[in-house]
Curated annotation (Swiss-Prot):
A Pfam family it matches: Gmad1
Stored InterPro entries: GerMN (IPR019606), Lipoprotein_LpqB (IPR023959), Lipoprotein_LpqB_C (IPR018910)
Species of the source: Arthrobacter sp. (strain FB24)
Name of the protein described by the UniProt record: Lipoprotein LpqB
GO terms for cellular component: plasma membrane
Gene that produces this protein: lpqB
Length: 573
């Protein structure tokens, strides 16, 4: 590729980005309209949804320029990518499905192949987003080649063969796409579980509905449930919003035959999913465009979204388990002394008085319940900080007898002192060869944060917990990965979509990070010297760190001293 087309392309890219930013700052979408006003694909569109006006093919442009300009035009989604289709032959224009996949790149180049008129569009890929909005992040340097075939039509180069999908610059993606959670249920229909997707900001209501009907992302399959039966589909190509009501027209047979409870759960699931859409006030279920009545007889409780944790923390003070709350410590109610066991890393159940902790060498996991002495559950060469879920199972991870990583779960509640305790050992294939540094169950008990290491490289991942009908853990799904340039070894949940992670050090400055399922970049918190433990309550303002100088709470862009004495504070969970 010569220098001149490249310079033209860079100038066009800069102009495109400026245009997008200007449009973002000034474009206003009406929030209200006359009674009976109906919107279609624009339904639920944010006020600042941008519009990009791409450039049509230039006469006499060479093959490389046509390829580059075509992909730049892929940011222009108006009229079903009408301008981008001008770069294609008639047959290719009809066959091309731009919404099947979006590749987001950091940089690109056009590379000639050994085949005449066939080129590769080589990308340094930052993200890949599929037709259902499921995004996959890639580290810098990840390459992908898109094969492109060109031919001449009336003396002008046009693209005759190209894979479905578009490829857009990272800066453009951040402007025209947004992160939107769609919601599923835990198996007991008690909690709403977010499944964050990435959609074009102008197509959110229809896209969210289609994605919801397609089911959860791979890392949540088997861990969550949907009120919508498999195979249920939209029967219209749009989801119009009329006077604030999103009209969702579904397969008539399945909808009419569903129980009143299931229909209410369908409506609730959609309402949760649309909660961030400014044009949507309520949801109507329809069959053949006729309104289907949804009755609420009080038998179905609304699910809890973004489950809160109690304000108290459990900690260790002078070798004993204590409660830490409002910057004060008090004895842990009804729990016998465990000072002889050297407790560290304590955890408290969010739903009972069960407690777990490790011994000082972090090799033995203990549980203790009111009225009973502490009970050793397992001994390994090393174990992770215990973590409880809503189902009252306590989790840890460590090497098994053959050295391979195992994830362990125990249920100490309502077990007599001499009785066998329910126990599960899992060895998911995706953890083979890895050492787990942290395993923390999410507040609704459906997912887990897993930090693992192999050959000095760390991964921060979220997995789904698959359970039997009685709630017993059965498997951990292949996870989704949250990218960070650092090598954290500790992490905690901050909300239902965000975790805080850090690499502990008693001697160096430590910079915790917030990693979110709904963000493309980590958010670094203020550094603090010697942080060795981290805990989090409800939201980023309730993050606590511990160093040799005491406990500190995040305050704005800094840390506020709290109390010196207690160590290893941890919120229930």
């Amino acid at each position: 590729m010569t220098g001149t087309p490249s310079k033209l392309r860079n100038a066009a890219l800069a102009l495109m980005t400026l245009l997008l930013l200007l449009l973002t700052s000034c474009a206003q979408i009406p929030r209200s309209g006359p009674v009976g006003k109906s919107t279609d694909e624009s339904a639920g569109k944010p006020n600042n949804a941008p519009v990009f006006f791409p450039v049509a093919p230039r006469e006499g442009a060479g093959p490389e320029s046509v390829i580059e300009d075509f992909y730049l035009a892929g940011s222009g989604y108006e009229d079903d990518y009408a301008v981008a289709r001008e770069y294609l032959t008639q047959a290719a224009s009809v066959a091309w499905k731009p919404d099947q996949r979006t590749l987001v790149f950091r940089s690109t180049r056009v590379v000639r192949t050994g085949v005449e008129n066939v080129f590769n569009y080589e990308l340094d890929v930052a993200y890949s987003v599929d037709a259902d909005g499921i995004a996959t992040q890639f580290p810098e340097g990840t390459k992908e080649n898109i094969p492109v075939t060109l031919t001449q039509v009336d003396g002008q180069w046009r693209i005759s063969a190209i894979p479905d999908g578009i490829a857009i610059p990272e800066q453009t993606f951040k402007v025209i796409y947004g992160a939107y959670p769609i919601y599923f249920y835990d198996p007991g229909f008690t909690y709403a579980v977010p499944d964050v997707r990435w959609f074009n900001k102008k197509k959110t209501v229809k896209a969210m509905t289609s994605a919801l009907l397609s089911g959860p992302a791979p890392y949540l399959k088997g861990a969550v449930v949907s009120a919508f039966p498999s195979g249920m589909k939209l029967t219209r190509e749009s989801v119009p919003v009329v006077s604030g009501a999103a009209q969702v027209d579904l397969s008539a047979k399945e909808l009419v035959e569903a129980s009143s409870e299931d229909r209410l759960r369908m409506q609730t699931q959609l309402a949760l999913t649309f909660r961030g859409q400014p044009d949507v006030v309520n949801v109507e279920l329809r069959a053949n465009q006729d309104l289907v009545r949804v009755e609420d007889n009080g038998s179905v409780l609304p699910p809890v979204r973004d489950k809160n944790v109690p304000a108290r923390q459990i900690a260790v003070n002078d070798g004993q388990l204590v409660r830490y709350e409002n910057n004060r410590i008090s004895p842990l109610p009804d729990i016998q002394s465990v000072g002889a066991l050297g407790p560290v890393s304590p955890a408290e159940s969010p739903v009972s008085q069960s407690v777990a902790f490790l011994n000082n060498s972090r090799t033995t996991l203990y549980s203790i319940v009111p009225g009973q002495p502490a009970r050793a559950l397992t001994t390994r060469s090393t174990l992770t900080h215990p973590s409880f879920g809503q189902q009252d199972w306590v989790w840890t991870a460590g090497p098994g007898a053959n050295g391979a990583t195992e994830v362990l779960a125990y249920r100490p509640t309502n077990v007599a002192e001499a009785a066998a305790m329910p126990t599960v050992t899992l060895a998911p294939a995706w953890l083979a060869g890895r050492t787990v540094k942290e395993f923390r169950v999410s507040r609704e008990g459906v997912r887990a944060l897993v930090i693992s290491e192999q050959n000095g490289k760390t991964r921060v991942q979220v997995t789904g917990i698959v359970r039997n009908a009685d709630g017993t853990p059965r498997d951990l799904t292949a996870p989704t990965t949250l990218l960070t340039d650092r090598e954290p070894d500790q992490g905690v949940w901050v909300s239902d979509t965000t975790v805080a992670v850090m690499k502990a050090s008693a001697t160096d400055n430590v910079t915790p990070e917030l990693l979110s399922l709904a963000a493309t970049q980590p958010q670094q918190l203020a550094p603090w010297p010697g942080l060795t433990a981290i805990s989090a309550g409800n939201g980023p303002e309730e993050i606590f760190g511990q160093s040799a100088d005491g406990i500190f709470q995040r305050l704005g862009n800094g840390w506020s001293p709290q109390l010196k004495g207690p160590v290893d504070p941890s919120f229930p969970g």
